[in-house]
């Protein structure tokens, strides 16, 4: 999604949101990530301006004080940015890939089933279409945000094909954007 993303070329406009819209977004975030509820006022303080940065390909990035927090495509589900995930790692369930998969994930490749079932990997129970943080064997922080394409049980049974779709990874265009004023 953000492999060839560039702030100067892909951002079309930025609008400040009304309080009623912010409330709706906060409720949507709580529905999607129940764990985040007690931290939401810390992540999105009431007095700080909340803006939506609109980009090409119908991508919207939610910002507070210029800090990129969440993004979505076409009114779909929100995904946390990796910078937010590094501050609050508990907001998403984790899956762990082995060391051999790291370079492929960091180049934007989807996570294949064998990379989740090999000895260095850890596959935790999760349903299909769940948003997950991808951790790496021996690393502390998440290296990508992904969406489960199969349930964890199916990944273990089939052990072929794409297990998790890579949505946003370290060093992609969104990671390089850092802040938006």
From Swiss-Prot:
Q: What is its main location?
A: cytoplasm
Cross-referenced NCBIfam families, in alphabetical order?
unchar_dom_2
Please report the name of this protein according to its UniProt entry.
Answer: Malignant T-cell-amplified sequence 1
Q: Which family does it belong to?
A: Belongs to the MCTS1 family.
Query: Do the record's keywords include Thylakoid?
Result: no
Q: Where in the cell is it found?
A: Cytoplasm
One Pfam family of this protein, by short name? Pre-PUA
Gene Ontology terms: cellular component: cytoplasm
User: How are the domains described in the entry?
Assistant: The PUA RNA-binding domain is critical for cap binding, but not sufficient for translation enhancer function.
Q: One MF term in GO for this entry? A: RNA binding
> Which SMART domains does the entry mention?
PUA
Which stretches make up the PUA domain?
A: 92-171
Function according to Swiss-Prot or TrEMBL: Plays a role as translation enhancer and involved in cell cycle regulation.
Query: Which keywords appear in this protein's UniProt record, sorted alphabetically?
Result: Cell cycle, Cytoplasm, Growth regulation, Transcription, Transcription regulation
